[in-house]
Amino acid sequence: MAKCQAVFLLVGALCVLSLAGVANAAENHFKVQGMVYCDTCRIQFMTRISTIMEGATVKLECRNITAGTQTFKAEAVTDKVGQYSIPVNGDFEDDICEIELVKSPNSECSEVSHDVYAKQSAKVSLTSNNGEASDIRSANALGFMRKEPLKECPEVLKELDLYDVKAN
């Protein structure tokens, strides 16, 4: 009889613990990570002479797809290796979430391109309903541009077989 009661008690405890896990699963917690660099050749991608940026400010903003209203906003500053991390609570399945550059710590490398073709933000998916198992979301690297390209840029572009591209 005592064994039977112990088994029922153990089964009941397991049921309660499993329900607690289901209750916690309803709230999503994500971490958005990314990197900021100085685009030393003004070509909108990293090269071997690009530099990481400590102290750069980025913002994460989510907007509802249909209404266009802002549903989430947070800022972060890059660390000594140029990386940032933004904690996010909630699920934003019906939103477009983007990381944008806000402020550069380097006045010589502080321009954000506004050309139509330029990558001005990095999109991230902040929902658990997309097949991604991890709660860490990695954003593409974003770069501030130098006011003038470095003198080594033509050589670097040639190494990449980009002969017709000119650092602007």
Swiss-Prot record:
PROSITE patterns: OLEEI. The keyword Disulfide bond applies. This is Pollen allergen Che a 1. Keywords: Allergen, Disulfide bond, Glycoprotein, Secreted, Signal. It is found in: Secreted. Pfam families: Pollen_Ole_e_1 (PF01190). Belongs to the Ole e I family. Residues 1-25 form the signal peptide. The keyword DNA damage does not apply. Glycans are attached at residue 64. InterPro entries: Allergen_Ole_e_I_CS (IPR006040), Pollen_Ole_e1_allergen (IPR006041). Disulfide bonds join 38-109, 41-153, 62-97. One of its GO terms (cellular component) is extracellular space. It comes from Chenopodium album (Fat hen). Its main location: secreted.
